[in-house]
């Protein structure tokens, strides 16, 4: 955050945040409202939601949704973390890919025919055509997402300027604490699910406000969300579905439904299930996203009828500082998308999917908190934060 503000010299900082489920194809650790509080306390002025229909997608669609929202908000600059750290390398990569598009496409098909996943095939194709140039390493996850952010800016003819900050010490997929002061989100989540959910082990790696809000959420709702939380519901759902029904689930490829139905029979946890269905053809993240769509019953037809293309249909405001509120007051009339402060009266196929995904996410809570929170997700107004007094209003 400090580096972003220094790099962009921004007046207002805006975060586009996934809701209940994440791009990796897994539930968020705590609710979007608690994560909004963490963001506001950490220095963000406006927190807006990236809808499920974009948030649980491949990098290209995820980036298109995020950039369309930022563009509608009138953002001048974006900043993302990457393993590379040089924004010009991203533009070089896109330029070379376009010049060698035919070769690139042929290589992708060749690597897929050899049994590689699409992600692995594209990574290998990039490696081949980019060798010897000042370009990015397309085997790194944050580089991949960053490339799609810039691609989205260009394809949407946006005037947004891109910046990137090099990620140091902790890597995206690190599962253990390898540095005394910096840890990956993956390692922090894993640590929280070891033993009796001890929060003290993560204190050196997260801001005080974040650890306090994590503890508060756990003490109120008695859960931190991960896939194992939902495994009983997930297994029940699969045991009551046919292969034909599974074929309609979004991102389900032909033949995968039979493997899923066969392996769920003896699976005793989500981890053992994933290990059983994992093959060279599909990445772990891709399979988790399919599982997320099964859990939320998101179908191919639904996503198609939502007609999301490259643009989000609305902006859901989750939280704002006083500075953020002032920015909205001045710029609201110029925004090219509807700004929602609640979802009581707004209707859209993307929002229908969102409501169902939220309800499924909150099924992990006990009654009466579950029903109360499901209703609050619809009626909740944005969280307001006084950045001077550091208090929520």
Curated annotation (Swiss-Prot):
Pfam families, A to Z: HIGH_NTase1
SUPFAM superfamilies linked to this entry: Nucleotidylyl transferase
Reactions that this protein is recorded to catalyse: cytidine(34) in elongator tRNA(Met) + acetate + ATP = N(4)-acetylcytidine(34) in elongator tRNA(Met) + AMP + diphosphate
GO cellular component, one term: cytoplasm
Gene Ontology terms for molecular function: ATP binding; ligase activity, forming carbon-nitrogen bonds; tRNA binding
UniProtKB keywords: ATP-binding, Cytoplasm, Ligase, Nucleotide-binding, RNA-binding, tRNA processing, tRNA-binding
Domain of life: Bacteria
UniProt keyword Transcription present: no
Subcellular localization: Cytoplasm
EC number: 6.3.4.-
Record: residues binding ATP: 81, 142, 167
GO biological process, one term: tRNA modification
Job description of the protein: Catalyzes the formation of N(4)-acetylcytidine (ac(4)C) at the wobble position of elongator tRNA(Met), using acetate and ATP as substrates. First activates an acetate ion to form acetyladenylate (Ac-AMP) and then transfers the acetyl group to tRNA to form ac(4)C34.
Name by which UniProt lists this protein: tRNA(Met) cytidine acetate ligase
Species for this entry: Bacillus cytotoxicus (strain DSM 22905 / CIP 110041 / 391-98 / NVH 391-98)
Encoding gene (name): tmcAL
């Amino acid at each position: 955050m400090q580096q972003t503000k220094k790099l962009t010299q921004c007046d207002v900082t805006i975060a586009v945040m996934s809701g209940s489920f994440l791009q990796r194809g897994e539930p968020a650790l705590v609710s979007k409202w608690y994560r909004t509080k963490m963001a506001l306390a950490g220095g963000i002025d406006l927190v807006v939601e990236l809808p499920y229909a974009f948030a649980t997608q491949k990098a290209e669609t995820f980036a298109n949704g995020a950039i369309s929202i930022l563009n509608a908000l009138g953002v001048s600059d974006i900043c993302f973390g990457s393993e590379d750290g040089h924004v010009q390398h991203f533009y070089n990569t896109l330029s070379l890919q376009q010049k060698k598009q035919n070769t690139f496409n042929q290589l992708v098909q060749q690597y897929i025919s050899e049994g590689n996943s699409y992600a692995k095939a594209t990574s290998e194709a990039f490696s081949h055509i980019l060798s010897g140039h000042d370009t990015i390493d397309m085997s790194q996850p944050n580089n991949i997402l960053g490339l799609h952010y810039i691609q989205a800016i260009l394809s949407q003819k946006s005037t947004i300027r891109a910046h990137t900050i090099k990620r140091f010490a902790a890597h995206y997929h690190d599962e253990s604490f390898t540095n005394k002061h910096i840890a990956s989100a993956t390692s922090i989540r894993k640590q929280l699910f070891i033993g009796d959910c001890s929060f003290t082990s993560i204190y050196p790696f997260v801001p005080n406000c974040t650890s306090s809000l994590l503890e508060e959420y756990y003490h109120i709702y008695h859960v931190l969300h991960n896939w194992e939380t939902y495994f009983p519901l997930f297994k029940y759902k699969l045991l009551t579905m046919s292969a034909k029904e599974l074929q309609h689930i979004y991102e389900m490829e032909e033949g995968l439904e039979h493997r899923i139905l066969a392996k769920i029979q003896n699976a005793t946890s989500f981890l053992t299930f994933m290990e059983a269905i994992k093959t060279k053809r599909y990445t772990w993240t891709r399979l988790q996203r399919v599982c997320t769509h099964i859990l939320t019953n998101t179908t191919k037809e639904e996503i198609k009828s939502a007609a999301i293309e490259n643009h989000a249909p609305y902006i859901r405001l989750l939280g704002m500082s006083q500075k953020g509120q002032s920015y909205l007051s001045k710029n609201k009339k110029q925004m090219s998308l509807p700004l929602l402060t609640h979802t009581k009266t707004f209707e859209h196929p993307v929002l229908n999917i969102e409501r169902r995904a939220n309800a499924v996410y909150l099924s992990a809570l006990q009654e009466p908190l579950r029903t109360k929170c499901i209703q609050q997700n619809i009626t909740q107004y944005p969280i307001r934060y006084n950045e001077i007094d550091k208090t929520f209003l």
